[in-house]
């Protein structure tokens, strides 16, 4: 197989595996309930509470306390949400990791078209993490017959940048 054929091979075409939307509140109670409501309205999906991994006395957090909410989006839901979220953020190369994942924050949830400011709730920010992979990545995650991904098939920050620029019409800055 020549160099140009391998570059356009269907197993080398990256795709959006998932988008994780996360809101860290740092405490339970009413602020956490408000965050759940906001994230469910923005994503149209049921949220899951996240718990603290360790006790931090300075913040009054005990291990196992609910301190945030998250939603995982896949398929068309992920594409639709990412289209909206990318318009609200300036993306730079430093927001990509070595394996092609992208993380960015949205400082104000009211920037989303479906949201309006409510003085009873206030303003919440949220984190968005995208996972961009190539077909065949499951072999490194499955339980049986796990295998490593060859270096030439792994995603890089440059591959992920090119994927976002072509599929989501985003300009990635230095």
UniProtKB/Swiss-Prot annotation:
One of its GO terms (cellular component) is ribonucleoprotein complex. The keyword Amino-acid biosynthesis does not apply. One of its GO terms (molecular function) is rRNA binding. One of its GO terms (biological process) is translation. Keywords: Ribonucleoprotein, Ribosomal protein, RNA-binding, rRNA-binding, tRNA-binding. It holds the Pfam family Ribosomal_L5. Transmembrane segments: none annotated. NCBIfam families: PRK04219.1. Part of the 50S ribosomal subunit; contacts the 5S rRNA and probably tRNA. Forms a bridge to the 30S subunit in the 70S ribosome. This is Large ribosomal subunit protein uL5. The gene is rpl5.
